[in-house]
Each structure stands twice: as C-alpha cells, then as structure tokens.
From Swiss-Prot:
Pfam families: IF-2B (PF01008). GO terms for cellular component: cytoplasm; nucleus. PANTHER family: METHYLTHIORIBOSE-1-PHOSPHATE ISOMERASE. This is Methylthioribose-1-phosphate isomerase. It comes from Arthroderma otae (strain ATCC MYA-4605 / CBS 113480). Belongs to the eIF-2B alpha/beta/delta subunits family. MtnA subfamily. It comes from the Eukaryota. The keyword Phosphoprotein does not apply. It is found in: Cytoplasm; Nucleus. It catalyses: 5-(methylsulfanyl)-alpha-D-ribose 1-phosphate = 5-(methylsulfanyl)-D-ribulose 1-phosphate.
Length: 385
C-alpha cells in the first residue's frame, strides 16, 4: 500500500502531519482555506507539489461546505472576488514554491473565464473551481509516474555505470516522494522507476538538516517500499562521492522553483551537492514537473528565499528512546535544545543552484538538456519555439 500525504474526497480533506512522521501517523482535517494556510506554513505538509494541492483543495472544501449549506452568494462577481482573495492569501503561506502560485494563477484564470460564459451564478464558478482543483490532484500523481520513467531512462543512458549495463547508485536530498506530492514522487519517483526496471543498485539519502526531511520522511518511504538504501548526514556527501566502490551514477533532487535559465531553488544544501557532483564527475539532475518551472522569472537571483525560525536549527523533536516500539497513542514526542544558548542563527529554507551545475532537468513530458552553447531552453517543454 502506497503512502499518502493527502486524503481527499469531495467535502473531506485530511493531511498527514509530517512533523510527526515517522514516529506517529496522524492526519489533520482541513476544512477551510485558513486551515490549509496554517498546515502549509507550519510545515505539517511540505514538498512543492503537495503544498499546491493542499492549498487549492482546502479552498475546494470551503466552497463545497458553503454550497452544501446554501451560504454561497448567488452573485458571480462576489464569488469570483471571494475565490481570488482566498487564492492570494494561500500563496503567502510558502512564497518560494512556485507550484502554489502557478496553481493559483491557473485557477484564477479558469474562474474568470467561466464568468464570461453565459449568465453564470455564484455556484457555477464554485463548481468549476472544485472540479479543476480535483483534476490537479489526479494529474499530479499521473505526471509523477511519467517523470520517474523519463529520469530513470536518462540515468541509465547517460552515465558511465548505466552505459556499462550495471545497476546504478543514486543520492537524493530532502523528501521528494509520495509525502511531497500527490503520489509516487519526483526525484524519489525516479528512484522508484529505477527499482521497477531492475536498474537500481542502492539509494542514499541525506538527513537534510535542519528539518531532517531526509532522515524522517525519505528514509521512511525507502523502508516502507523496501528499497535498498542508506542514510547519511549532510556532511558525509563528499566522502560518499569519493568512494570509488559506491557506484554512484547521479545525484537526483527535486525543486521548489526552476526559473527560465535553469537556476533551481531547492532545499538548503542542494547547491553544495551540485558543486560536489561537478568535482567528482557525477551527474546532477533536477526532477520536477512543469508546474515547478517559472518562465516569468529569468534568473535565480530573483527568487525570494524564505527564512525560517531560529528554533528549527537549535532544537530537535523526536520520541523518547523508551517509547520506540510502543503503540502510537503511547508515544511521547519531546523537543530538546541542541545548540549553545544565545548563539545567533541563520536559517534559509532554500538555496539556488546555478544552471551550469545541472546536467538535466527531468519533467513529465521529457528531459531538458543544455544546448551547444551550454544553455537550457526550458520554453520548449511548453511547446514554445
């Protein structure tokens, strides 16, 4: 049974509380856009694709509730303004992840176009929104399977280990699997596709400080799916790449935003992995759906980088050792301080990897590689010349 970060049916949305995974599997009910904003901002849900889906579905639940109780305005103008205002609000929850703003723009456009058809009532606009949001959930899972297959094929065909017909080793960072998407995953989806085609030798995942998404979430998924894998600390990556016997063919990461020239914002620590990959001759691959590509932003220096609370670096949360193996209801999670009191902290959530350190950008429609001039032409992924 696959892991689910999002449980949805019309009128019901539940989000897996990823702050408690892997020790406790608890789902948080979400019934309004405000509740959606908070589960995203407080990182109960994370991963750019999952953030977008939870955001748009939270408003879907709110609109469905209003329609069911006949509290929705009958005026199309009022419902249009209501939806647009809520979408703008939801986008503020995590500004770096472009998937959310992309989904909001698409849904705004849909609602505005629906208002121009015939003489719609407020309910017509709300129903159009709900149907479109639900389709985004379905499409994301399907796109991830295609993306995973494209990425796996590229690694096999474009790395020395793969060309020799050997199984490949892959290193990944943060969490990009079923818990970060509607299902299957992006970078972790590539690893799943390698395993499915019997091309995976071993997967490695970084712990991904300071939030430990790799140690808590990616490791959880790898164990759940019985994928051969090893956890390393972030500072061990260079030593791993230097091990000739490791058989590492590629580093595969996800993305929160890929801009027009290919510069990529992703979880803090991604940039240093790209530098290490370049030095050691290991392919560095970004795996992300087209919803993560932001052609409106030209270069990485224009990306807004979210900075988070100092306490995320100075404290850590987990169960007491004595509680391990107990039933979930008997597990107590405790937070302890791990840093010297009074020390200053810098805590950017993301960094930007320059395009020239990236070998390929894998999407659900194919793989983008640099041209003879060393430049990505990402607009071609959207059918532009």
């Amino acid at each position: 049974m696959s892991l689910q970060s999002i449980r949805y049916k019309r009128g019901m949305l539940q989000v897996l509380d990823q702050l408690q995974v892997p020790h406790v599997e608890r789902y948080i009910p979400v019934s309004t856009a405000k509740e959606g904003w908070h589960v995203i901002k407080e990182m109960h849900v994370r991963g750019a694709p999952a953030i977008a889906i939870v955001a748009v579905l939270s408003l879907s639940i709110e609109l469905t509730e209003l329609m069911d109780h006949e509290k929705l305005s009958t005026e199309a103008d009022e419902v249009e303004a209501y939806i647009l205002e809520k979408l703008d609000y939801l986008v503020t929850s995590r500004p770096t992840a472009v998937n959310l703003s992309d989904a909001a723009i698409k849904l705004k456009t849909l609602v505005q176009k629906r208002k121009q058809i015939g003489d719609p009532k407020g309910k017509d606009l709300a129903e159009a929104y709900v149907e479109a949001a639900e389709k985004m959930l379905i499409d994301d899972a399907m796109d991830n399977h295609r993306l995973g297959d494209f990425g796996a094929t590229w690694i096999v065909n474009n790395t020395p280990v793969g060309k020799e017909g050997k199984k490949v080793g892959v290193l990944t960072h943060c969490n990009t699997g079923s818990l970060a998407t509607a299902g299957y995953g992006t970078a972790l989806g590539v690893i799943r596709s390698l395993l499915a085609s019997d091309k995976l030798e071993h997967a490695y995942c970084t712990e991904t400080r300071p939030y430990n998404q790799g140690a808590r979430l990616t490791a959880f998924e790898l164990v759940h799916d019985k994928i051969p894998a090893t956890l390393i600390t972030d500072s061990m990556a260079a030593s791993l790449l230097a091990q000739k016997g490791a058989g590492l063919a590629a580093i595969v990461v996800g993305a929160d935003r890929v801009v027009a020239n290919g510069d990529t914002a992703n979880k803090i620590g991604t940039y240093q992995l790209a530098v290490l990959a370049k030095y050691h001759g290991v392919k560095f691959i970004v795996a992300a759906p087209r919803t993560t590509i932001d052609l409106r932003t030209k270069e990485g220096e224009d990306i807004i980088i979210e900075e988070r609370a100092k306490s995320e670096v100075t404290r850590i949360t987990g169960p007491r050792i004595s509680d391990l193996g107990k039933n979930e209801e008997n597990i107590t999670l405790e937070t302890v301080n791990i840093a010297a009191p009074g020390i200053d902290v810098w805590n950017p959530a993301f960094d930007v990897t320059p395009y020239d350190l990236i070998d390929a950008i894998v999407t659900e429609v194919g793989v983008a590689e640099k041209n003879a001039d060393g430049l990505f032409q990402l607009e071609k992924l959207f059918g532009f010349p």
